[in-house]
A protein has these predicted regions:
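Low-complexity, acidic Ser/Thr/Pro/Gly-rich terminal tails and inter-domain linkers that flank the onset
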Residues: 44-67
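Short, surface-exposed ligand- or partner-binding patches at beta-edge/loop junctions that are enriched
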Residues: 139, 147-171
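Acidic, serine/threonine- and proline-rich intrinsically disordered appendage/tail regions
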Residues: 152, 171-194
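Short, solvent-exposed loop/turn segments enriched in Ser/Thr/Gly
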Residues: 67-74, 154-159
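The feature marks short-to-medium sequence segments in extracytoplasmic or secretory-pathway proteins
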Residues: 88-133
């Protein structure tokens, strides 16, 4: 009887330690998340002619249409900080799942000599041009992906897109109404900013 009570006490102590340690891990994760929030919300006034940063913008995902397994959409970025900045080229995209894990992406910048697709918006099919954006101005880019799996490929569910405007720059986060499911190793066709 005494041995049974001792084993029961050890078991209850183990359960209590396990339960408390799980809560401590969750608390650490929450603290880590809130630490990154102030960094992404910092904005500064920029003199004219400097490169745009993701932190200068608010993003909106524009649901598109699909045809023959190819889904088309666009993203509108609105400059929310004072001053003006310049932008030229293609966005750098990162896809995340519902837990925030980064998903594989295989971007193809269009237009290119390698062919590819034509976006429904004619501006998206033009080469990159230099854009100067003041507070309240908008810029867009188009994207497309196949939602039809081939062979043994997986179609991941991306619920968040981080858009980086320049290499090493900050990002703006965009959340689509419906998850993106790019198949074929995360192949996403991307237009330049227009």
């Amino acid at each position: 009887m005494r041995r049974t009570l001792t084993l029961l006490g050890v078991f209850l102590a183990f359960v209590a330690i396990f339960t408390l340690s799980r809560h401590a891990t969750t608390s650490t994760t929450t603290t880590s998340s809130s630490t990154t929030t102030p960094t992404s919300s910092t904005t500064t006034t920029k003199p004219a002619g400097t490169g745009c940063l993701g932190s200068d913008f608010r993003g909106q995902f524009n649901q598109g249409q699909g045809a023959a397994g190819t889904i088309y959409a666009s993203v509108t970025l609105t400059k929310s900080s004072a001053g003006s900045c310049t932008l030229k080229g293609w966005p750098r995209l990162t896809l995340q799942d519902k837990l925030g894990a980064q998903l594989p992406i295989n971007p193809a910048n269009l237009p290119s000599s390698a062919g590819g697709i034509q976006f429904p918006t004619s501006q998206a099919n033009q080469p990159p041009s230099l854009l100067t954006l003041a507070k309240g101005a908008t810029t867009n880019f188009s994207l497309a992906y196949s939602d039809v799996p081939t062979a043994n490929s997986v179609c991941d569910n991306a619920v968040t897109i981080s858009v980086q405007l320049s290499v090493g720059g900050s990002t703006v986060t965009v959340t689509p109404l419906f998850a993106l499911q790019p198949c074929n190793n995360g192949r996403v066709w991307v237009s330049p900013f227009y």
